[in-house]
Amino acid sequence: MLDFVKLMMGQDPKPVRALVEIYTKQASSACIRAKWLLCHKGVKYTEYRIDQDELAAITMVDRTGGRRDLPQIFINNQHIGGDSELDRLNREGELDHLLAEVYNY
């Protein structure tokens, strides 16, 4: 909806070019909220379900410096945090900028 409003105001939404990864588990309302926001923005992300993949859980804890709360989100290998941090970035208008950055493999 926000992209539609920006388009109507003459502000084209930036295309998503970033590498987005999210660590989740089933039936987590915070994970569902984060995935909904990403989908709403047209983001294609890689999801790692730590309740189904022990190696993903270990990797998440290592990549986040010990955080175990879910979800944990990375954009272009930069640790963003959880759903509240993602929501804050979105409200402040920074999320679209992060998502528009090209990931160099």
For each predicted feature, which ranges?
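Local sequence-structure signature of Cys/Sec-based thiol-disulfide redox active-site neighborhoods
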Residues: 6-46
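Generic recognition of short, well-ordered alpha-helical segments
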Residues: 32-36, 59, 84
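Post-cleavage N-terminal segment of exported redox proteins
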Residues: 2-4
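Short beta->alpha junction loops/turns
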Residues: 27, 50-53, 78
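Thioredoxin-like thiol-disulfide oxidoreductase module
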Residues: 50-68, 94-105
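Non-catalytic, surface beta->alpha helical segment in thiol-disulfide oxidoreductase systems
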Residues: 75-105
